[in-house]
């Protein structure tokens, strides 16, 4: 996967964790 996609997924995961 492109590094950009990895960063997007990582950021999304962090945002989801913050919502919990």
Curated annotation (Swiss-Prot):
GO molecular function annotations of the record: serine-type endopeptidase inhibitor activity
Keywords, in A-Z order: Antimicrobial, Fungicide, Protease inhibitor, Serine protease inhibitor, Vacuole
GO BP of this protein: defense response to fungus; killing of cells of another organism
Cell compartment(s), UniProt: Vacuole
GO cellular component, one term: vacuole
Residues in coiled coil: none
Source organism superkingdom: Eukaryota
Function of the protein: Inhibitor of serine proteases chymotrypsin, pepsin and trypsin. Has strong antifungal activity against the human pathogenic fungi C.albicans TIMM 1768, S.cerevisiae KCTC 7296 and T.beigelli KCTC 7707, but lacks antifungal activity against the plant pathogenic fungi C.gloeosporioides KACC 40003, C.coccodes KACC 40803 and D.bryoniae KACC 40669. Lacks hemolytic activity against human erythrocytes.
Family as reported in the entry's similarity comment: Belongs to the protease inhibitor I3 (leguminous Kunitz-type inhibitor) family.
Record-given protein name: Antifungal protein J
Organism expressing this protein natively: Solanum tuberosum
Organism lineage string: Eukaryota, Viridiplantae, Streptophyta, Embryophyta, Tracheophyta
């Amino acid at each position: 996967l492109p590094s950009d996609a990895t960063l997007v997924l990582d950021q999304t995961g962090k945002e989801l964790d913050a919502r919990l």
